[in-house]
Amino acid sequence: MWARNLMARALYDNVPECAEELAFRKGDILTVIEQNTGGLEGWWLCSLHGRQGIVPGNRVKLLIGPIQETPSGQDQPTSGLMHQTFGQQKLYQVPNPHSAPRDTIYQVPPSYQHQGIYQVPTSHGIQEQDVYQVPPSVQRSIGAANGPHLSKKVVTPVRTGQGYVYEYPSRHQKDIYDIPPSHTTQGVYDIPPSSVKVPVFSLPVGEIKPQGVYDIPPTKGLYAIPPSACRDEAGLREKEYDFPPPMRQAGRLDVRPEGVYDIPPTSTKPTGKDLHIKYNCDAPGAAELATRRHQSVLLNHAPSQLGQSPGAQNDAYDVPRGVQFLEPPAETSEKANPEERDGVYDVPLHNPPDAKGSQDVVDGMNRLSFSSTGSTRSNMSTSSTTSKESSVSASPSQDKRLLLDPDTAIERLHRLQQTLEVGVSSLMALVTTDWRCYGYMDRHINEIRTSVDKVELFVRDYLHFARGAVANASCLPELTLHNKMKRELQRVEDSHQILSQTSHDLNECSWSLNILAVNKPQNKCDDLDRFVMVAKTVPDDAKQLTTTINTNAEALFRPGPGSSHVKSGSENIMNSTEYPHAASQMPLLHPGDHKAQGLNKPLPPSLGKDQPPDCSSSDGSERSWMDDYDYVHLQGKEEFERQQKELLEKENIIKQNKLQLEHHQLSQFQLLEQEITKPVENDISKWKPSQSLPTTNSSVGAQDRQLLCFYYDQCETHYISLLNAIDALFSCVSSAQPPRIFVAHSKFVILSAHKLVFIGDTLTRQVAAQDICHKVMNSSNQLCEQLKTIVMATKMAALHYPSTTALQEMVHQVTDLSRNAQLFKRSLLEMATF
């Protein structure tokens, strides 16, 4: 069909993504052998420099049509191309199967090299058959004068010194052109309305306005041809409101609107108040007014009327009357008439915890602390409280879930955690070396008491949210995440028990100065000392639990469609800072209750089976080293080195793929493995101080300065190993290596950064100055969170390979890790020298 000697000029640079694709530069002349070769729409078989391959048809332009096999065909000067006829200047030539003229498909202005604007074709006979979409590179070429040309290849930063920088802004690399687009995609190229010279249809203005500002329909069609042009105006307004017609026409309260809520009508007797409303509201206007008044009364007196039957309340409100955000008082629920509690959506009273739940709490009391700063954590939280107290505090929240979307839940969680950290920091600011002397306590007793009360309140509010998140985790198919969160929650609950008890004891003694003021050191800790010691450990436990919830937010917080009305009806309460735990107070129907068995729609809806599995859970053969990665479980040097060795041996790329790796790759893996296995030194007696450190300030103690300098040298050594691992990973990504290669390289990156986290944890346990301890802890926690993000980004890059977007996101996260590691190393030096 096609002549063999078609010539085409390359319009853009092309970087091949596979071995069959040709690489060429802008301006190269290619020989077109076959168009749409092998049935691949938009791909041409071309030849360049003696090599054949496929090229994207929208990146080249045919020259002059078929050329006779004469030497003059290729020696034509390029300057003559600017003076060709209009039929030869088209960016795209669409072959017409009906032999129609091709000069009306795309009209390009003479200055298309600088503008790139297409005019709307006036012929519509073949617009739905032969449509070429504008590749993203054409749109990006407009700004080529302001920045470098962006290709579809993953861009990796360049190492400069001990950091990485992009040669140009890398965030523009997302969603770049991967595959020549299919012509079935709709609405890719927005055509300015001013470029339409000849209107397709003459429509009245009134029919166009309801469709929006732009006259390009959001559905079918690539050009300004409204598909709804033939509809009448009444048809456009059919979906103006979502209210069903029976809602507007209901003149009596006993007539149920169709399709509002699938609740069978109850057979309870209406109260006298409802009868008064029912028989005095014959007119529609009166019924609507009475309904509004009745609802306002219910909202104002909700706690006292929760025990009444749903029949006493109007069904126009989306939320069933039996389901409220606050629990009914015990006396109201117990004295309620059983006949009035037969509604389908009545919420049963909370059952006492079963034996299994109590046993879980008792087991949690005997747990070991796995915190990254575990050696500084006081063990009073487990030894000072009984299992009975802990089970009483934990059991009422086990059947309450949070019906929130992930974004709202994460935002609220971070707000609660930040409030808790600020409260503890305010309390710690009042704790000095002589803070228990009579003079200091006399001046600051009120401030200390206020801070103590705030810390206890902030911990309680945080626990309300955390218990709801743990309840959500209990509904997941895999219980791995639930068990982990329950252990982390137990630590916070243990601490809260001590805080509550000590705060109560302090209030019992009325914060007497004669009791609290101590003029000489004492060996025994009193209630105030216990409160301060336990409060100091709470932010670490809360940080660990927050990280777990944040990482698995997509699996934990996914309310079903039936919970949207609950959120809208309680939005003001749920978002109020005065009631941060309102969402966690929503009761659930007990699975064994006889009333719950007749429900077609459980409230709230449980997570479906089609929900993706939890990120932190893994099973069987699909478990990889990333699923086992949990860097917060650091105990000591021996366990740390053992864990590093296990992670390194698992899925060892050298042992599995020796025959498939090239020689330089094998040597690179072996070199990285040698650097990773280098241990972190803890023996400071063998360390020789560096002479290059500047003179220190006297504000840092000699022992703390020695520790900072010692671990700074350790950090410097392992930071170089981290940079080498990152270099190898970026080189692997740039050379388009498969997932099994770049995942193995990412393991070296994570293990190298893991050592920096271990250095930070060890230093936190050994320094004496509290401000240095907090700074090192914060930097170490940032590295921890960054490592979690990199693990997830690497998983996504491997699962969605060869997605450029996923690979680019992984590169961004690794680059951010290098910056955070450099800041961590620099902070150690600054604290040691200033």
From Swiss-Prot:
PANTHER family: CAS SCAFFOLDING PROTEIN, ENHANCER OF FILAMENTATION 1
PTM note: Polyubiquitinated by ITCH/AIP4, leading to proteasomal degradation.
Region (Required for interaction with PLK1): 710-834
Residues recorded as bearing Phosphothreonine in the entry: 804
Major site of localization recorded for this protein: cytoplasm
Keyword Nucleus: yes
Protein's name in the database: Enhancer of filamentation 1
GO cellular component terms listed in the entry, alphabetical order: basolateral plasma membrane; cell cortex; ciliary basal body; cytoplasm; cytosol; focal adhesion; Golgi apparatus; immunological synapse
Compartments reported by the entry: Cytoplasm, Cell cortex; Nucleus; Golgi apparatus; Cell projection, Lamellipodium
A matching Pfam family: CAS_C
Biased composition (Basic and acidic residues): 332-344
Region (Divergent helix-loop-helix motif): 710-760
Function as written in the Swiss-Prot or TrEMBL entry: Negatively regulates embryonic fibroblast migration. May play an important role in integrin beta-1 or B cell antigen receptor (BCR) mediated signaling in B- and T-cells. Integrin beta-1 stimulation leads to recruitment of various proteins including CRKl and SHPTP2 to the tyrosine phosphorylated form. Promotes adhesion and migration of lymphocytes; as a result required for the correct migration of lymphocytes to the spleen and other secondary lymphoid organs.
GO biological process: cell adhesion; cell division; cell migration; cell surface receptor protein tyrosine kinase signaling pathway; cilium disassembly; learning or memory; lymphocyte migration into lymphoid organs; negative regulation of cell migration
Disordered: annotated segments: 328-402, 584-624
UniProt keyword terms in alphabetical order: Cell adhesion, Cell cycle, Cell division, Cell junction, Cell membrane, Cell projection, Cytoplasm, Cytoskeleton, Golgi apparatus, Growth regulation, Membrane, Mitosis, Nucleus, Phosphoprotein, SH3 domain, Ubl conjugation
Domain observations: Contains a central domain containing multiple potential SH2-binding sites and a C-terminal domain containing a divergent helix-loop-helix (HLH) motif. The SH2-binding sites putatively bind CRKL SH2 domains. The HLH motif confers specific interaction with the HLH protein ID2. It is absolutely required for the induction of pseudohyphal growth in yeast and mediates homodimerization and heterodimerization with BCAR1/p130cas.
Motif (Caspase cleavage related site): 360-363
Alphabetized InterPro entries for the sequence: CAS_C, CAS_fam, NEDD9_SH3, Serine_rich_dom, Serine_rich_sf, SH3-like_dom_sf, SH3_domain
Residues with Phosphoserine modification: 296, 369, 780
Subunit record text: Homodimer. Forms heterodimers with BCAR1/p130cas. Forms complexes with PTK2B/RAFTK, adapter protein CRKL and LYN kinase. Part of a complex composed of NEDD9, AURKA and CTTN; within the complex NEDD9 acts as a scaffold protein and is required for complex formation. Part of a ternary complex composed of SMAD3, ITCH/AIP4 and NEDD9/HEF1; within the complex NEDD9/HEF1 interacts (via N-terminus) with ITCH/AIP4; the complex mediates ubiquitination and proteasomal degradation of NEDD9/HEF1. Interacts with ID2. Interacts with CTTN (via N-terminus). Interacts with MICAL. Interacts with TXNL4/DIM1.
CDD domains: FAT-like_NEDD9_C, Serine_rich_NEDD9, SH3_NEDD9
Biased composition (Low complexity): 368-397
Similarity-based family: Belongs to the CAS family.
GO MF annotation terms: protein tyrosine kinase binding
